[in-house]
From Swiss-Prot:
Protamines substitute for histones in the chromatin of sperm during the haploid phase of spermatogenesis. They compact sperm DNA into a highly condensed, stable and inactive complex. Testis. It comes from Monodelphis domestica. This is Sperm protamine P1. The lineage of its organism: Eukaryota, Metazoa, Chordata, Craniata, Vertebrata. PROSITE patterns: PROTAMINE_P1. Keywords: Chromosome, Developmental protein, Differentiation, DNA condensation, DNA-binding, Nucleosome core, Nucleus, Spermatogenesis. Residues 1-58 are annotated as: Disordered. Coiled coil: none annotated. Belongs to the protamine P1 family. GO terms for cellular component: nucleosome; nucleus.
């Protein structure tokens, strides 16, 4: 019984844990990196005031 339980736990953890962690980590990392670079970088400061001014003028 001990061997069967150990195998079932290891398989369940490897299938669910690895797939969920890898899929979420890749998606979140790619999206967070792109958004953080744009907001902290050149585009965020220049784009935010321009968008507000254009909307008010229109």
């Amino acid at each position: 019984m001990a061997r069967y339980r150990r195998r079932s736990r290891s398989r369940s953890r490897s299938r669910y844990g690895r797939r969920r962690r890898r899929s979420r980590s890749r998606r979140r990392r790619s999206r967070r990196r792109r958004r953080r670079r744009g907001r902290r970088g050149r585009g965020y400061h220049r784009r935010s005031p321009h968008r507000r001014r254009r909307r008010r003028r229109r």
